Amino acid sequence: MRLTVKQVTWLKVCLHLAGLLPFLWLVWAINHGGLGADPVKDIQHFTGRTALKFLLATLLITPLARYAKQPLLIRTRRLLGLWCFAWATLHLTSYALLELGVNNLALLGKELITRPYLTLGIISWVILLALAFTSTQAMQRKLGKHWQQLHNFVYLVAILAPIHYLWSVKIISPQPLIYAGLAVLLLALRYKKLLSFFNRLRKQVHNKLSL
């Protein structure tokens, strides 16, 4: 049985709760000693992992809708992507304000040079920013065929974000490996589209360098 519009609407409500409840828990944990010995790192890792979960969920929607024959499920993809961006922004903000401090934001440029995993994180966030800004139907109509080309950059985020996570942890544990494995699996499900995206990107870079 296929999902109805009403059921998808309720599903969106549940997904909004899934995006909001972790934030409420984090606020509670901060105020009630629910974090570990290094609360700053805990906040950074929690926000980053939550962003990664929503990224993976976003990538899951298309193959799930196709194989389950639930076309209306696609309507939840934008919502999940926006929650991914929201949590990625919280992740970046927690690093900038809690790790560096308001008075040391000028050090961010130096940090990006000395810690390459931060560069991967910033690149991922900038891409997510562009995708969030252009996620509306109005922007889709305005950009035309270029809209899909832009939004295919989510595949690059799906590669960079797990590497950023793996690189940032001092001790490799199963958790970042699981996230990386899930990202590889979700990318493998659309390998033809992935190859087409990177071939087009390679040609564009080559053309720019040839000018």
Swiss-Prot record:
One of its GO terms (cellular component) is plasma membrane. One of its GO terms (molecular function) is electron transfer activity. Keywords: Cell inner membrane, Cell membrane, Electron transport, Flavoprotein, FMN, Heme, Iron, Membrane, Metal-binding, Transmembrane, Transmembrane helix, Transport. This is Protein-methionine-sulfoxide reductase heme-binding subunit MsrQ. It is found in: Cell inner membrane. It holds the Pfam family Ferric_reduct. Its cofactor is FMN; heme b. GO terms for biological process: protein repair. It is a multi-pass membrane protein. The chain crosses the membrane at residues 10-30, 82-102, 116-136, 153-173, 178-198. It comes from Escherichia coli O81 (strain ED1a). Belongs to the MsrQ family. Binds 1 FMN per subunit. Binds 1 heme b (iron(II)-protoporphyrin IX) group per subunit. Heterodimer of a catalytic subunit (MsrP) and a heme-binding subunit (MsrQ). The keyword Metal-binding applies. Coiled coil: none annotated. Disulfide bonds: none annotated. Signal peptide: none annotated. The gene is msrQ. PANTHER family: PROTEIN-METHIONINE-SULFOXIDE REDUCTASE HEME-BINDING SUBUNIT MSRQ. It comes from the Bacteria. Part of the MsrPQ system that repairs oxidized periplasmic proteins containing methionine sulfoxide residues (Met-O), using respiratory chain electrons. Thus protects these proteins from oxidative-stress damage caused by reactive species of oxygen and chlorine generated by the host defense mechanisms. MsrPQ is essential for the maintenance of envelope integrity under bleach stress, rescuing a wide series of structurally unrelated periplasmic proteins from methionine oxidation, including the primary periplasmic chaperone SurA and the lipoprotein Pal. Its main location: membrane.
